[in-house]
Structure formats: C-alpha cells, structure tokens
Amino acid sequence: VVAVDGVSPVSFNLASGSYNVALRHRNHLGAMTTSSVALSSSSTAVDLSSAGTSTFGTSARKTITGTFPTQALWAGDVTFNGQVKYTGSGNDRDPILTTVGSTTPNNTVSIYSTRDVNLNGQVKYTGSANDRDPILVNVGSTTPNNIRQAQLP
C-alpha cells in the first residue's frame, strides 16, 4: 500500500509508538495485525499479504494459491457494512444489478465504484469477469447463504 501518488509511503500523523495496523479497501473486508507494530517517522513495512503476518480474528484474509501464493483481503463488501453477503436482504449482489440497470442485466458500466468487485473499472452483473461471482465464491460457492464477516474490532 502506498500513498495516493502511487509511490510514496503512507504516513500517519501519530506519535511514535506501537499500534495495531488495519487495512481496508473500497469494497473489501479489512484485516488487522494481531500484534502491535512499532511505528515512527521512518518507514515500517507491514506485509498483510504474507501468511507469516498474524491477523486479528478468524480467516481475516483469503488465501490465494497457485504460482504466486499470497494472502488477500476478502472482496465483495459492496454495501460497505463489514460483511460479504450473496443472498437475502442487504446483500452485496443486488446493488451490482441496480448499477447496470435492473431490467438490463447484460449491461456493463465503466465507473469507479464500490460495485466494481474485481477492480477492472467496470460494473458487470453477467458474463465473464462479472462482479457478482467473486461474492459467491467468497461466501462459499456451495453455501450461498453464508455471510463472511469483517474481522476488525
């Protein structure tokens, strides 16, 4: 994670000390370090993508396997309420349909939005690379009624 210029380190206007570091992103559930991290005026690396970095809660990050295994934030919190939910009231799937036009689910909208779950610059409800499927996968494809909760205090 870098500052909004894309290269500079993130800085906080805080006194030097030990802090738990938490990270949230547009439509992802946040993750936080279990242990406090010493922060000061010099840069400190906190690698939440590393399986070796312990996080608060249970299954706070998604394990990505394959050629480049890593840990990632859970995508799909379209409603920004601290949960990823595929079915039922207040789910994260319906706002995607609303964005593309409820009566035209095949539409694609190019926009910066919390409803762009796969972060490709488009909101898409059906077809390949749609924003609905990652929500289903992240709650459990065979258990669409599950709800994935943020693991932040």
Task: Give the ranges of each region predicted by the language model.
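Cellulosome-associated attachment modules in secreted, modular CAZymes
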Residues: 1-153
